[in-house]
Amino acid sequence: MKRKISYVAACLGLAQLALLDSNALAQQRPVAALNEVVVTASRSPKKISEIGKVVRVISAETLAKSQGRTLPEVLNNIAGITIGGNGGNPADVKAVYMRGASAANTLILIDGIPLNDASEISGEYNISAIPIDIIDRVEILKGGNSTLYGSDAVAGVINIITKKGTGVLSANVLATAGSYDTYKQVLGLTGQIQNTTVTLNAINSDSKNFSSAAPAQGVTNFDKDGFHQKSVLLNIGQQVNTRFSIKGNLQANNNLADLDAGAFSDALEYTYNKSSILAGIGGILALNKGTLNFNLSQNNVKNRYNNQGSVTNNTGNITHLETNLNYNFSKSIDLAGGVSYKKLSTEQYNPYSSALFADNTISSAFTSLFFRTQTGFQAELGGRINNHSDYGTNFTYTINPSYLFAERYKLFVNLSSAYRVPSLYQLFSDYGNLALEPETATSFETGFDLNFTQHTNLSLSYFKRDIENVIDFGQIATNKFGYINQNRQKDNGFEIELGLKPLSAISLNAYYAYVTGKVTTPINTAFNLFRRPKNSYGLNAGIELSEKVSLNLIYKHTGDRIDRYYDGKTFKTVQADLGSFNMLDAYIQFKATSKLILFSDVKNLMNEDYIEFAGYQTKGLNFNAGFRLGIN
């Protein structure tokens, strides 16, 4: 505890010194960080300096220097985010733990559209199914944000913005090869023809990999679990006239993988086939002082498990319709508001339980007012009313004042509520409970973002989150077990980030994140952040070795964790202590010509032997290399 206080005190001291000298520093050009424009935090384009929340951006430039990596690998190096299973087999589920919250409490968006899987137990989407090659940038919004985005935005929002056509029509080819017989090929086409933009990407990935399950002591190696992924992305835009544009998108994905029976348990004939289609159409109407947006999307997922002839078929379908208005009343007041409708349905068949046919709907309306003054004071006030076809109505709010000094020092406070609705499985399956209420959360957050010079940035944020009606598996009635609202979860922590550019050719970003949490059940109160470290820190270093050669060094320390797994021999749940580990990766890129880029990525340089999930393996020292060729 003393160490935590000393960290905060030191950062506040630096902030005080910076503010005392703000008049001198205000004459310098502000760093790009606060001037960067994002859309996720307010549902309309705003500079980060105007937003009283923690926003982080993975830019197109960063992704361009991550060729051959995966989306989970890139997200894992953001302060306060741990991707469970990041170092495991690609077929393993990747769990997004933001600020210590469960994976279901982080909302994933693609181009602003909520991405869920109605066929899964808790409804979250596996981000390993999203190829990094279709992504232009990623905006990460931390804290409770259900007022703007509805269910699941309890710990934060990750908005994956896909590539759109710009410039002259051109093609590109990417190919990689690496450890574990891993290969990937990408063919892309992008550009603009008069008033029409188009982006088309086709991706094929294959890997023989290694056994997901770790062999128990005294057992020989298990068989390899392969992974195969095929994906297609199509984005089309049409500028109809000076005020109105339309867009359409199609993302099709198929994953085929070999699975194991569980922790320390192999399976020779267990396969998984996941296919998904996300299609949408939308439009933007420019008004005199704002914009009117509409989006209609359809998200269909099919999951098929075949375990030695025993077949499970689960399908999930989500229809989502949304209309948003952004309006500028004046230089001081902006309005964001909208209405949305979502229908979820699932059909599930397996040999072990009754067939499941279920659906429900969620309707909501929200509004958010943004105020700014010439003195630097800014505030956002918002609310959302939600109506669920099963449990009824609930309300969320946001109160978010901030203050901007000298265009480069930002202080903020954020008080908000958020919620997560129970999934179709939790409501209607053999273990379902129609009396379930949504999980409801209240969050408090405060911090600062200080740009001392154009080469130095320091940020600190503290958060506290209280979730009631936590959905758990327990006894509903005599001799009946299922899902029930019975727990209360309390989490808190802080994050520190320091960005430096000591030389024009060197960029450094260091971070430290701390989180702790306890759950209160009818029996006791205990720490329960399974698979999530209390402490994590890292350093990302970018070095331009020459005009054509760049080097990125990526280091992350993941602290001690605890885990639980089911022991198939004793038929009991076992708790395991997972030790801390350090990961060091190196990525080097050579721009051979204006159109040809060569790259190599070496991961786990220290060949660290570590565990992310008890009973499962992770990768040792591994690499991939490849090229990207542009064709006009």
Can you say where each PLM-predicted feature lies in the sequence?
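Conserved C-terminal beta-signal and adjacent last beta-strands/turns
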Residues: 8-13, 26, 187, 237-240, ...
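Structural signature of Gram-negative outer-membrane beta-barrels, strongest in the C-terminal barrel
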Residues: 241, 330-336, 340, 344-467, ...
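Outer-membrane beta-barrel signature, preferentially recognizing the C-terminal barrel domain
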Residues: 265-282, 286, 404, 409-410, ...
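Short acidic/polar hinge/loop motifs at secondary-structure boundaries
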Residues: 114-142
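Extracytoplasmic beta-strand/coil segments of soluble accessory domains associated
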Residues: 72, 76-114
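N-terminal periplasmic accessory domains that precede
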Residues: 36, 71-74, 94-97, 109, ...
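Periplasmic-side early beta-strands and strand-to-turn transitions of outer-membrane beta-barrels
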Residues: 159, 166-167, 176, 191-270
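Gram-negative outer-membrane beta-barrel transporters
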Residues: 373-375, 464, 485-566, 594, ...
